[in-house]
From Swiss-Prot:
GO-annotated cellular components: cytosolic large ribosomal subunit
One MF term in the entry's GO annotations: mRNA binding
Pfam hit, one: Ribosomal_L12_N
Cited function: Forms part of the ribosomal stalk which helps the ribosome interact with GTP-bound translation factors. Is thus essential for accurate translation.
GO biological process: translation
Name used for this protein in its record: Large ribosomal subunit protein bL12
InterPro entries: Ribosomal_bL12, Ribosomal_bL12_C, Ribosomal_bL12_C/ClpS-like, Ribosomal_bL12_oligo, Ribosomal_bL12_oligo_N_sf
Family as reported in the entry's similarity comment: Belongs to the bacterial ribosomal protein bL12 family.
Xref: SUPFAM superfamilies: ClpS-like (SSF54736), Ribosomal protein L7/12, oligomerisation (N-terminal) domain (SSF48300)
Length: 122
């Protein structure tokens, strides 16, 4: 069987966010690996390391009891369709948005926590 990298990439381009999330989880389980980015360990830089961060990833770690409201909040924040937003809420933990400013990340966190979600800023 020939390995066709381009065919795999083309099929990934057509997949929904929910399908890609399921694929990542299946690969993690099959190969006993983690798709999370390695965390750099800060040296003796002091407390300024956290303050110097200029972009954040908003991760929904728990969707809470009000899933419909959580899905609506994710749709409002991301602009995703219903199916993709539902996939993110159903498959927590999931990254809602990457590389946003601190103010924008805190606004998103507040909106998701309003509907019972638990959010982590990375």
């Amino acid at each position: 069987m020939a390995f066709d990298k381009d065919a795999i990439i083309d099929s990934l381009k057509e997949a929904s966010i929910s399908d890609l999330n399921d694929l990542v989880k299946a690969i993690e389980e099959e190969f006993d690996v983690s798709a999370s980015a390695p965390v750099a360990v800060a040296g003796a830089a002091g407390g300024d390391a956290a303050a110097a961060k200029d972009s954040y990833d908003v991760e929904l770690t728990e969707s809470g009891d009000q899933k419909v409201k959580a899905i609506k909040a994710v749709r409002d924040i991301t602009g995703l369709g219903l199916k993709d937003a539902k996939g993110l809420v159903d498959n927590v933990p999931s990254i809602i948005k990457e590389g946003v400013s601190e103010d924008e990340a805190n606004d998103m966190k507040a909106k998701l926590e309003e509907v019972g979600g638990v959010v982590t800023l990375k």
